[in-house]
């Protein structure tokens, strides 16, 4: 009955954009369980949601050490000719990879998308080939990318379900960058840019991810909500205005969020905080073996299966007859997030304080 009522509310007073079709998916990014769907496999123009794939590739290049956050990204003549939204960087001028990431997320800069495509793959065409190869790996069956920014192109097509898959992967594979999506403004080359996602200023449980708009696509969003251990991801295509898009996605997210959340603007909570809570330190216990060799093998297994664990300190301590392996963290939320990631891989963990 609740789904029927939501579908009725979802359809009332909608005048469809000229080319776009309303589509939405709401679900859990970790389990891929879908709670709500409308036209989830209908092909639409993804507009700037295309940049989520561009960002995924950037993060992957950083992880593989083929890029560094301090690397310079130069703007070619071709990049400077890109249509707005753009930074307007002059030909042969540059920004860093670190700045470019913020420019894609906050400003949604199309010229920056071309510049990074050229840096990674030599030219836009080769980068698009890479984008589609990644899409195939991510099982985005109804997606074809034609550029790295999402400006109008008849061949640049995707679906709400495929963008849900892509957004889920960027959340799972690169959680260390999630706080970047929650930024409401950024400074680049002496200019301050404000986010297009005004929901970030109103609700402290939303963490990005990306908005998009062209005349043919309508207003779109990929939106992540985090409340303690409750992750909810919403995709919405085809709004007639930013206000309508925000109202509709917020309505749907509220219906399917499992826990109540505060609307405190002043204390925006990010996925991982590096603050100490009451001077406590936390340990995530990951294994207990009689032989130290097995403990070491288990740590290697964890690091291979769960990328985020590679950036944390692991230690093994003997307790009686057993060798106990731990991950040391500074706060309870980080401990819970890591433990949840471990459990999602059908492995055990235990949180302890010290």
Task: Please identify what each model-predicted range represents.
Residues 161-164, 168-282, 290-354:
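Extracytoplasmic
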Residues 18-159, 171:
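Active-site-adjacent loops and short helices of periplasmic peptidoglycan-processing enzymes
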Residues 35, 285-287:
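Local beta-strand/beta-hairpin segments that build beta-sheet-rich folds
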Residues 3-14:
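Sec-dependent N-terminal signal peptides
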Residues 2-3, 136, 285:
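Terminal, positively biased "leader/anchor" segments
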Residues 50, 77-79, 91-93, 118-120, ...:
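A mature extracytoplasmic/lumenal domain signature
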Residues 16-22, 215-218:
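Short, flexible loop/turn motifs enriched in small residues
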